[in-house]
Amino acid sequence: MPAYKYNRVFLIVMDSVGIGEAPDAADFNDEGAHTLGHIAEHMNGLHMPNMAKLGLGLIEDIKGVEKTEHPLAYYGKMQEASNGKDTMTGHWEIMGLYIDKPFKVFPEGFPDELLQELEKRSGRKIIGNKPASGTAILDELGQEHMETGALIVYTSADSVLQIAAHEEVVPLEELYRICETARELTLDPKYMVGRIIARPFVGEPGQFKRTPNRHDYALKPFDRTVMNELKDCGLDVISIGKISDIYDGEGITSSRRTVSNMDGMDKVIDTLGEDFTGLSFANLVDFDALFGHRRDPEGYGRALEEFDARLPEVFEKMREDDLLIITADHGNDPIHHGTDHTREYVPILAYSKKHKKAQMLPLADTFADIGATIADNFQTNKPKYGKSFLSLLQ
């Protein structure tokens, strides 16, 4: 096996943790957005001593986050090059792919012609058709669904079409078949939906409960990613959280589902104790799903502090030849108008026990610099986009 600078790379994406408006924020109606900064102000200071030690406070002024004189990590920020601010666009770019046309979101619900075709093909009526929290819409429409057999269709601030059905009303196989039909219909460029999600549930009105039989029908990345290159070279690519869904399983050698940020951190810490060579790639979605979209700066702030408190466990289990990269995929400022993501810079922190004198990284004009660096480290084919910063890490 070739000698790699780092035998294992641990990449953690803090979903939606932006660090200030991007230069093109106005094009996305996001002027003034600053996810981390606004949460810190709302909390009258964030308590993130471990991220501070890495150098977070040196990237931007964040209330409560100390500016250390001796950062442990190389630190900086990255600007998104792709034309979009959703999860798939951000993650695909991290691994070397650009999206020219953003995935579509449906804040007013899906077009009638799409739903009429889905009703025709499925033989079932559709109710809902609006952005909603998955649990709230069951409380609202679950009983009607049980009485009529109509499908509950809803969306979120992301590019998703979700179909909820009671397992005793619509058998799982039928629900999955309907979702496959929806996937096929929404490949049409005029819809361009990132993901279709089957959301089965059980229980009685007032006590509905979603089951683990959720199934995602994503789009395959339009081209090869750095993960495909790693896998083809016989390296491990371990997915933690929704990474496998985001890339539709492409380039992944093993996948671990998570139920929360803390479960995600448990899984990261588990992989630190395993022998492998390659990439462990984790997404911590709670920041975005539970707090960003719901415009809950208090909950978001607490989640950031909980994440920070787990980092010493990560540091302790890291080996000399491990590299930890912490970043984000877009912003979702809970103080901002609306409930959508925000077009922001994202932070990047790159830490290894072997680094002697960490310093600031040059401003990256694409998230793909991360993928390029990982490809460079493992001596695989380079992605079309991105510039490796591997040689800067000393």
From Swiss-Prot:
Cofactor, how bound (note): Binds 2 manganese ions.
Protein residues bound to Mn(2+) 2: D288, H293, H341
Record's keyword terms, sorted: Cytoplasm, Isomerase, Manganese, Metal-binding
Pathway participation: Carbohydrate degradation; 2-deoxy-D-ribose 1-phosphate degradation; D-glyceraldehyde 3-phosphate and acetaldehyde from 2-deoxy-alpha-D-ribose 1-phosphate: step 1/2
One Pfam family named in its UniProt record: Metalloenzyme
Chief location category: cytoplasm
EC identifiers of the protein: 5.4.2.7
Keyword Iron among record annotations: no
InterPro entries documented for this protein: Alkaline_phosphatase_core_sf, DeoB, Metalloenzyme, Phosphopentomutase_DeoB_cap_sf
Residues annotated for Mn(2+) 1 binding in this entry: D15, D329, H330
A biological process from GO: 5-phosphoribose 1-diphosphate biosynthetic process
Primary role: Isomerase that catalyzes the conversion of deoxy-ribose 1-phosphate (dRib-1-P) and ribose 1-phosphate (Rib-1-P) to deoxy-ribose 5-phosphate (dRib-5-P) and ribose 5-phosphate (Rib-5-P), respectively.
Protein name: Phosphopentomutase
Lineage, broadest ranks: Bacteria, Bacillati, Bacillota, Bacilli, Bacillales
Gene: drm
